[in-house]
Curated annotation (Swiss-Prot):
Belongs to the queuine tRNA-ribosyltransferase family. Coiled coil: none annotated. PANTHER family: QUEUINE TRNA-RIBOSYLTRANSFERASE. One of its GO terms (biological process) is queuosine biosynthetic process. This is Queuine tRNA-ribosyltransferase.
Length: 367
Protein backbone atom coordinates (compact mmCIF):
# COMPACT_ATOMS: atom_id res chain seq x y z
CA UNK A 1 0.00 0.00 0.00
CA UNK A 2 1.49 3.32 -1.08
CA UNK A 3 1.89 6.20 1.36
CA UNK A 4 1.03 8.65 -1.45
CA UNK A 5 -2.39 10.28 -1.61
CA UNK A 6 -3.71 12.29 -4.57
CA UNK A 7 -6.59 14.76 -4.33
CA UNK A 8 -8.15 16.25 -7.45
CA UNK A 9 -9.35 19.60 -6.13
CA UNK A 10 -10.77 21.30 -9.20
CA UNK A 11 -11.03 21.07 -13.00
CA UNK A 12 -11.38 23.64 -15.76
CA UNK A 13 -11.94 21.87 -19.06
CA UNK A 14 -9.26 19.18 -19.05
CA UNK A 15 -6.88 21.22 -16.85
CA UNK A 16 -6.57 19.91 -13.29
CA UNK A 17 -5.75 21.45 -9.91
CA UNK A 18 -4.66 18.94 -7.30
CA UNK A 19 -2.49 17.98 -4.36
CA UNK A 20 -0.18 15.00 -3.84
CA UNK A 21 0.47 14.14 -0.20
CA UNK A 22 3.51 12.29 1.17
CA UNK A 23 4.83 11.89 4.73
CA UNK A 24 7.69 14.21 3.65
CA UNK A 25 5.34 16.95 2.44
CA UNK A 26 2.63 18.06 0.03
CA UNK A 27 3.02 18.85 -3.65
CA UNK A 28 0.57 21.35 -5.12
CA UNK A 29 -0.20 20.48 -8.74
CA UNK A 30 0.36 21.33 -11.53
CA UNK A 31 3.99 21.11 -10.39
CA UNK A 32 7.43 21.49 -11.94
CA UNK A 33 10.26 19.35 -10.55
CA UNK A 34 13.82 20.73 -10.80
CA UNK A 35 16.26 18.06 -11.99
CA UNK A 36 19.08 17.02 -9.65
CA UNK A 37 20.87 14.46 -11.81
CA UNK A 38 23.62 13.58 -9.34
CA UNK A 39 21.53 14.36 -6.26
CA UNK A 40 21.97 18.13 -6.57
CA UNK A 41 20.26 20.71 -8.76
CA UNK A 42 23.36 22.19 -10.39
CA UNK A 43 24.82 25.08 -8.33
CA UNK A 44 21.83 25.38 -5.93
CA UNK A 45 21.37 24.38 -2.29
CA UNK A 46 18.20 22.78 -0.86
CA UNK A 47 17.51 26.05 1.00
CA UNK A 48 17.50 28.02 -2.27
CA UNK A 49 15.22 25.46 -3.92
CA UNK A 50 12.73 25.73 -1.06
CA UNK A 51 12.86 29.54 -1.17
CA UNK A 52 11.82 29.53 -4.83
CA UNK A 53 8.87 27.24 -4.05
CA UNK A 54 10.09 23.78 -5.16
CA UNK A 55 8.22 21.02 -3.31
CA UNK A 56 9.77 17.99 -5.04
CA UNK A 57 12.98 17.38 -6.99
CA UNK A 58 14.08 14.66 -9.38
CA UNK A 59 17.11 12.41 -8.91
CA UNK A 60 18.72 10.20 -11.53
CA UNK A 61 18.78 6.49 -10.66
CA UNK A 62 21.27 5.61 -13.39
CA UNK A 63 23.90 8.18 -12.45
CA UNK A 64 23.53 7.80 -8.67
CA UNK A 65 23.79 4.01 -8.99
CA UNK A 66 27.07 4.34 -10.91
CA UNK A 67 28.42 7.13 -8.70
CA UNK A 68 28.61 7.31 -5.69
CA UNK A 69 26.71 3.99 -5.55
CA UNK A 70 23.84 2.95 -3.30
CA UNK A 71 26.05 1.61 -0.49
CA UNK A 72 27.33 5.12 0.27
CA UNK A 73 23.86 6.65 0.00
CA UNK A 74 22.37 3.97 2.28
CA UNK A 75 24.89 4.96 4.98
CA UNK A 76 23.04 8.30 5.06
CA UNK A 77 19.66 6.54 5.36
CA UNK A 78 18.39 7.68 1.96
CA UNK A 79 19.08 10.12 -0.86
CA UNK A 80 17.33 12.74 1.32
CA UNK A 81 19.89 12.17 4.08
CA UNK A 82 22.70 12.29 1.54
CA UNK A 83 21.75 15.55 -0.20
CA UNK A 84 19.97 17.41 2.62
CA UNK A 85 16.62 17.68 0.79
CA UNK A 86 13.87 16.67 3.26
CA UNK A 87 10.91 16.96 0.88
CA UNK A 88 9.74 14.35 -1.69
CA UNK A 89 12.08 13.05 -4.40
CA UNK A 90 11.12 11.33 -7.65
CA UNK A 91 13.75 9.11 -9.26
CA UNK A 92 13.64 8.05 -12.89
CA UNK A 93 14.39 4.39 -13.59
CA UNK A 94 17.52 4.78 -15.72
CA UNK A 95 15.71 3.76 -18.91
CA UNK A 96 16.14 7.11 -20.65
CA UNK A 97 19.85 7.32 -19.83
CA UNK A 98 20.43 3.81 -21.18
CA UNK A 99 18.48 4.78 -24.33
CA UNK A 100 20.70 7.84 -24.76
CA UNK A 101 23.85 5.68 -24.77
CA UNK A 102 22.89 4.48 -28.28
CA UNK A 103 25.41 2.00 -29.66
CA UNK A 104 27.11 1.57 -26.28
CA UNK A 105 24.21 -0.65 -25.12
CA UNK A 106 22.91 -4.15 -25.82
CA UNK A 107 19.20 -4.72 -25.27
CA UNK A 108 17.70 -8.12 -24.39
CA UNK A 109 14.49 -9.35 -22.78
CA UNK A 110 16.29 -9.52 -19.44
CA UNK A 111 17.56 -5.95 -19.45
CA UNK A 112 20.33 -3.77 -20.83
CA UNK A 113 24.09 -4.35 -20.86
CA UNK A 114 26.17 -1.25 -21.48
CA UNK A 115 29.57 0.30 -20.97
CA UNK A 116 29.79 2.55 -17.95
CA UNK A 117 30.29 6.16 -19.11
CA UNK A 118 32.59 6.57 -16.08
CA UNK A 119 35.17 3.79 -16.59
CA UNK A 120 33.91 1.74 -19.59
CA UNK A 121 33.30 -1.35 -17.43
CA UNK A 122 30.41 -3.63 -18.43
CA UNK A 123 27.22 -2.95 -16.45
CA UNK A 124 23.81 -4.66 -16.49
CA UNK A 125 20.54 -2.94 -15.59
CA UNK A 126 17.15 -4.67 -15.40
CA UNK A 127 13.69 -3.85 -14.00
CA UNK A 128 14.56 -5.74 -10.81
CA UNK A 129 17.87 -3.93 -10.32
CA UNK A 130 16.28 -0.54 -11.04
CA UNK A 131 13.56 -1.18 -8.43
CA UNK A 132 16.16 -2.23 -5.84
CA UNK A 133 18.32 0.84 -6.52
CA UNK A 134 15.31 3.16 -6.15
CA UNK A 135 14.32 1.38 -2.93
CA UNK A 136 17.87 1.90 -1.62
CA UNK A 137 17.66 5.60 -2.56
CA UNK A 138 14.45 5.93 -0.52
CA UNK A 139 12.63 7.59 -3.43
CA UNK A 140 9.12 8.86 -2.72
CA UNK A 141 8.11 8.28 -6.35
CA UNK A 142 9.70 5.35 -8.18
CA UNK A 143 9.50 5.10 -11.97
CA UNK A 144 9.14 1.68 -13.60
CA UNK A 145 11.99 0.56 -15.88
CA UNK A 146 11.23 1.14 -19.56
CA UNK A 147 12.85 1.62 -22.93
CA UNK A 148 12.38 5.13 -24.26
CA UNK A 149 11.26 4.63 -27.87
CA UNK A 150 13.64 6.56 -30.13
CA UNK A 151 12.54 9.09 -32.75
CA UNK A 152 12.08 8.45 -35.58
CA UNK A 153 10.78 4.88 -35.26
CA UNK A 154 8.73 2.79 -37.67
CA UNK A 155 5.40 1.46 -36.40
CA UNK A 156 6.97 -2.02 -36.07
CA UNK A 157 9.93 -0.64 -34.07
CA UNK A 158 7.66 1.45 -31.84
CA UNK A 159 5.37 -1.54 -31.20
CA UNK A 160 8.24 -3.88 -30.28
CA UNK A 161 9.79 -1.24 -28.02
CA UNK A 162 6.45 -0.49 -26.32
CA UNK A 163 5.67 -4.19 -25.77
CA UNK A 164 9.10 -4.75 -24.19
CA UNK A 165 8.46 -1.75 -21.90
CA UNK A 166 5.10 -3.25 -20.89
CA UNK A 167 6.71 -6.58 -19.96
CA UNK A 168 9.32 -4.64 -18.00
CA UNK A 169 6.54 -2.61 -16.33
CA UNK A 170 4.98 -5.85 -15.06
CA UNK A 171 8.36 -7.01 -13.73
CA UNK A 172 8.90 -3.58 -12.13
CA UNK A 173 5.57 -3.86 -10.28
CA UNK A 174 6.43 -7.36 -9.05
CA UNK A 175 9.92 -6.30 -7.94
CA UNK A 176 8.55 -3.15 -6.23
CA UNK A 177 6.69 -5.53 -3.91
CA UNK A 178 5.93 -4.13 -0.47
CA UNK A 179 7.84 -0.88 -0.99
CA UNK A 180 5.45 1.84 0.32
CA UNK A 181 6.85 4.41 -2.14
CA UNK A 182 4.57 5.31 -5.06
CA UNK A 183 5.28 3.46 -8.33
CA UNK A 184 4.44 5.15 -11.65
CA UNK A 185 3.97 3.38 -14.99
CA UNK A 186 5.25 4.96 -18.22
CA UNK A 187 3.22 5.10 -21.44
CA UNK A 188 5.26 4.46 -24.58
CA UNK A 189 4.33 3.88 -28.24
CA UNK A 190 6.21 6.53 -30.18
CA UNK A 191 4.14 8.80 -32.42
CA UNK A 192 1.40 6.19 -32.96
CA UNK A 193 -1.89 6.85 -31.16
CA UNK A 194 -3.10 3.24 -31.23
CA UNK A 195 0.18 2.06 -29.65
CA UNK A 196 -0.19 4.70 -26.92
CA UNK A 197 -3.72 3.35 -26.29
CA UNK A 198 -2.43 -0.21 -26.08
CA UNK A 199 0.34 0.84 -23.69
CA UNK A 200 -2.05 2.74 -21.39
CA UNK A 201 -4.51 -0.18 -21.32
CA UNK A 202 -1.73 -2.58 -20.26
CA UNK A 203 -0.46 -0.20 -17.57
CA UNK A 204 -3.99 0.24 -16.17
CA UNK A 205 -4.28 -3.55 -16.00
CA UNK A 206 -0.99 -3.83 -14.05
CA UNK A 207 -2.23 -0.94 -11.84
CA UNK A 208 0.15 1.84 -10.85
CA UNK A 209 -0.04 4.69 -8.33
CA UNK A 210 0.49 7.26 -11.07
CA UNK A 211 0.95 7.38 -14.83
CA UNK A 212 3.58 9.10 -16.97
CA UNK A 213 3.87 9.91 -20.66
CA UNK A 214 7.36 8.98 -21.86
CA UNK A 215 9.04 9.17 -25.25
CA UNK A 216 8.12 12.79 -26.01
CA UNK A 217 10.54 15.71 -26.50
CA UNK A 218 13.01 13.25 -28.06
CA UNK A 219 13.43 15.14 -31.34
CA UNK A 220 9.91 14.99 -32.78
CA UNK A 221 8.22 18.08 -34.31
CA UNK A 222 6.21 20.11 -31.78
CA UNK A 223 2.94 19.32 -33.59
CA UNK A 224 3.54 15.58 -33.07
CA UNK A 225 4.14 16.10 -29.36
CA UNK A 226 0.89 18.08 -29.06
CA UNK A 227 -1.00 15.46 -31.13
CA UNK A 228 0.11 12.62 -28.82
CA UNK A 229 -0.65 14.75 -25.74
CA UNK A 230 -4.10 15.62 -27.09
CA UNK A 231 -4.83 11.97 -27.67
CA UNK A 232 -3.33 10.49 -24.50
CA UNK A 233 -3.42 12.81 -21.47
CA UNK A 234 -7.19 12.93 -20.90
CA UNK A 235 -7.43 9.11 -21.13
CA UNK A 236 -5.10 8.61 -18.16
CA UNK A 237 -6.85 7.67 -14.88
CA UNK A 238 -8.66 10.65 -13.39
CA UNK A 239 -7.89 9.73 -9.78
CA UNK A 240 -4.09 9.43 -10.15
CA UNK A 241 -1.28 11.90 -10.92
CA UNK A 242 -0.35 12.43 -14.59
CA UNK A 243 3.31 13.14 -15.34
CA UNK A 244 4.82 14.35 -18.62
CA UNK A 245 8.49 13.36 -18.61
CA UNK A 246 11.28 15.66 -19.81
CA UNK A 247 9.08 18.54 -21.04
CA UNK A 248 9.71 21.41 -21.57
CA UNK A 249 9.52 25.08 -22.52
CA UNK A 250 7.21 27.46 -20.60
CA UNK A 251 4.70 27.27 -23.48
CA UNK A 252 4.90 23.46 -23.43
CA UNK A 253 3.99 23.45 -19.74
CA UNK A 254 0.97 25.71 -20.21
CA UNK A 255 -0.24 23.65 -23.19
CA UNK A 256 0.23 20.35 -21.34
CA UNK A 257 -1.67 21.61 -18.27
CA UNK A 258 -4.46 22.65 -20.66
CA UNK A 259 -4.57 19.00 -21.80
CA UNK A 260 -4.71 17.54 -18.29
CA UNK A 261 -1.10 17.00 -17.12
CA UNK A 262 -0.18 17.45 -13.42
CA UNK A 263 3.61 17.04 -13.18
CA UNK A 264 6.67 18.04 -15.20
CA UNK A 265 10.46 17.83 -15.11
CA UNK A 266 13.06 19.18 -17.49
CA UNK A 267 16.74 20.13 -17.45
CA UNK A 268 15.97 23.10 -19.70
CA UNK A 269 15.77 25.92 -17.11
CA UNK A 270 19.05 24.95 -15.41
CA UNK A 271 20.95 23.88 -18.55
CA UNK A 272 19.88 26.97 -20.48
CA UNK A 273 20.88 29.15 -17.52
CA UNK A 274 24.44 27.86 -17.76
CA UNK A 275 24.45 28.77 -21.46
CA UNK A 276 23.20 32.32 -20.86
CA UNK A 277 19.61 31.67 -22.02
CA UNK A 278 17.31 33.29 -19.48
CA UNK A 279 13.52 32.89 -19.32
CA UNK A 280 11.60 36.08 -18.56
CA UNK A 281 7.94 37.11 -18.53
CA UNK A 282 8.39 38.49 -22.06
CA UNK A 283 10.40 35.61 -23.52
CA UNK A 284 13.98 34.40 -23.65
CA UNK A 285 16.95 36.75 -23.15
CA UNK A 286 20.34 35.63 -24.50
CA UNK A 287 22.48 37.44 -21.96
CA UNK A 288 25.66 36.67 -23.95
CA UNK A 289 24.47 39.08 -26.65
CA UNK A 290 26.65 42.22 -26.81
CA UNK A 291 23.58 44.49 -26.64
CA UNK A 292 23.41 43.75 -22.89
CA UNK A 293 26.99 44.94 -22.26
CA UNK A 294 25.86 48.34 -20.96
CA UNK A 295 22.20 47.55 -20.18
CA UNK A 296 21.64 48.75 -16.61
CA UNK A 297 18.05 47.47 -16.38
CA UNK A 298 17.10 44.55 -14.13
CA UNK A 299 16.53 41.16 -15.71
CA UNK A 300 12.77 40.80 -15.30
CA UNK A 301 10.65 43.50 -13.61
CA UNK A 302 7.94 40.90 -12.94
CA UNK A 303 10.25 38.56 -10.98
CA UNK A 304 11.07 38.76 -7.27
CA UNK A 305 14.04 36.37 -7.24
CA UNK A 306 17.43 37.28 -5.70
CA UNK A 307 18.96 37.79 -9.16
CA UNK A 308 16.24 40.14 -10.40
CA UNK A 309 16.22 42.21 -7.22
CA UNK A 310 19.98 42.79 -7.15
CA UNK A 311 21.74 42.57 -10.53
CA UNK A 312 21.60 44.30 -13.90
CA UNK A 313 21.70 42.68 -17.32
CA UNK A 314 25.08 44.35 -17.82
CA UNK A 315 26.54 42.59 -14.76
CA UNK A 316 25.06 39.21 -15.77
CA UNK A 317 26.49 39.71 -19.28
CA UNK A 318 29.90 40.44 -17.73
CA UNK A 319 29.75 37.27 -15.57
CA UNK A 320 28.83 35.21 -18.62
CA UNK A 321 31.64 36.64 -20.77
CA UNK A 322 34.23 36.05 -18.04
CA UNK A 323 32.83 32.56 -17.32
CA UNK A 324 32.39 33.34 -13.63
CA UNK A 325 30.64 30.52 -11.75
CA UNK A 326 28.41 33.12 -10.07
CA UNK A 327 26.86 33.90 -13.46
CA UNK A 328 25.60 30.32 -13.85
CA UNK A 329 24.27 30.36 -10.30
CA UNK A 330 22.41 33.66 -10.65
CA UNK A 331 20.94 32.62 -14.01
CA UNK A 332 19.84 29.26 -12.55
CA UNK A 333 18.24 30.91 -9.52
CA UNK A 334 16.24 33.10 -11.87
CA UNK A 335 15.25 30.43 -14.42
CA UNK A 336 14.04 27.95 -11.81
CA UNK A 337 12.22 30.72 -9.92
CA UNK A 338 10.58 31.69 -13.23
CA UNK A 339 9.37 28.10 -13.71
CA UNK A 340 8.09 27.84 -10.12
CA UNK A 341 6.33 31.21 -10.45
CA UNK A 342 4.76 30.07 -13.72
CA UNK A 343 3.33 27.00 -11.97
CA UNK A 344 2.06 29.20 -9.10
CA UNK A 345 0.33 31.46 -11.65
CA UNK A 346 -1.21 28.43 -13.37
CA UNK A 347 -2.48 27.06 -10.03
CA UNK A 348 -3.90 30.47 -9.05
CA UNK A 349 -5.67 30.78 -12.41
CA UNK A 350 -7.17 27.30 -11.93
CA UNK A 351 -8.23 28.17 -8.36
CA UNK A 352 -10.00 31.27 -9.69
CA UNK A 353 -11.57 29.53 -12.71
CA UNK A 354 -9.73 31.64 -15.29
CA UNK A 355 -7.07 29.28 -16.65
CA UNK A 356 -8.42 29.51 -20.23
CA UNK A 357 -8.00 33.27 -20.11
CA UNK A 358 -4.53 32.93 -18.51
CA UNK A 359 -3.44 30.52 -21.25
CA UNK A 360 -4.53 32.87 -24.04
CA UNK A 361 -2.75 35.84 -22.44
CA UNK A 362 0.44 33.87 -21.75
CA UNK A 363 0.71 32.40 -25.24
CA UNK A 364 0.11 35.85 -26.77
CA UNK A 365 2.68 37.68 -24.61
CA UNK A 366 5.46 35.07 -24.24
CA UNK A 367 7.85 35.16 -27.20
Amino acid sequence: MTVMKFDLIKKEGKARRGKITFPRGDIQTPAFMPVGTYGAVKSLSPVELKEMGAEIILGNTFHLWLRPGTEIIKKHGSLHGFNGWDKPILTDSGGFQVFSLGKMRKLTEEGVTFKSPINSSKVFLSPEISMQVQRDLGSDIVMCFDECTPYPATEKEAKESMELSMRWAKRSKEAHGDNPSALFGIIQGGMYEHLRDESLAKLKEIDFDGFAIGGLSVGEPKEDMIRILDHTAHQMPEDKPRYLMGVGTPKDLVEAVYRGVDMFDCVMPSRNARNGHIFTSEGVIKIRNSKYKDDTSLLDPNCDCYTCKNFTKSYLHHLDKTKEILGSRLNTIHNLTFYQNLMKSIRKALDEGRFSEFRKEFLASYK
